[in-house]
């Protein structure tokens, strides 16, 4: 489907970012197949390096990460569209501002793909405005600390409490799930964001730690579980 691929070359991607300045929408339709989305127009509002930071480093990193996400959306969309999956494919991308203050910008880019069924996926970005640094999960903790173990233990505790209260269903030991399916630990680079209260929120994809009925589970980590190893 070369015409479809050529048309998608005009879909806008995100430029250097520090602050959301405007909104930009895009759309494309090919018969019963449609790609649409709304992206933030972002600008680097701090061209002068902050103390200990480098000018534009966070903006450039955010730009590259966002470009990779949009490329993934396009690639997945084209894969289904080229196969005329049940005659209809639709991909819709949007974003959510999770936190935007003087210290932190946290964004979520999300996509819903409909192709005989609905699949949701997303990616999270957290930018330290003071340093211009795009944060990884490990950046939040003291070097050499077992943050994976501490965070994983608190998530497992929350999962067990929700299951016991009939408020959730997760792949945890002691239930109907096999050992291979059960949650043991987060990835060192697990998706996360920092909420408006400074809390660490860990996010999982669909079916990663729970049945599809649970969507994309989020867990706010108890500060007491990580206070002795948290660096920022």
Q: What do the predicted segments below correspond to?
A:
Residues 1-232:
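Compositionally biased intrinsically disordered regions enriched in Thr/Gly
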């Amino acid at each position: 489907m070369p015409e479809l691929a050529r048309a998608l070359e005009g879909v806008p991607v995100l430029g250097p970012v520090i602050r959301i300045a405007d909104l930009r929408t895009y759309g494309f339709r090919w018969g019963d197949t449609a790609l649409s989305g709304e992206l933030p127009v972002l600008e680097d509002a701090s061209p002068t390096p902050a103390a200990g930071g480098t000018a534009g480093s966070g903006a450039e990193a955010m730009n590259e990460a966002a470009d990779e996400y949009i490329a993934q959306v396009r690639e997945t969309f084209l894969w289904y569209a080229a196969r005329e999956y049940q005659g209809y494919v639709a991909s819709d991308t949007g974003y959510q501002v999770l936190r935007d203050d003087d210290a932190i910008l946290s964004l979520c880019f999300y996509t819903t793909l409909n192709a005989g069924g609905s699949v949701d996926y997303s990616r999270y970005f957290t930018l330290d405005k003071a340093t211009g640094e795009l944060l990884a999960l490990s950046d939040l903790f003291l070097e050499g600390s077992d943050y994976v173990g501490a965070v994983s233990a608190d998530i497992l505790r929350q999962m067990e409490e929700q299951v016991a209260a009939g408020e959730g269903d997760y792949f945890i030991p002691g239930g109907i799930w096999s050992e291979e399916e059960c949650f043991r630990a987060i990835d060192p680079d697990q998706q996360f964001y920092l909420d408006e209260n400074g809390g660490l929120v860990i996010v999982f994809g669909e079916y990663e730690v729970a049945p599809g009925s649970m969507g994309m589970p989020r867990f706010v980590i108890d500060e007491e579980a990580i206070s002795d190893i948290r660096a920022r």
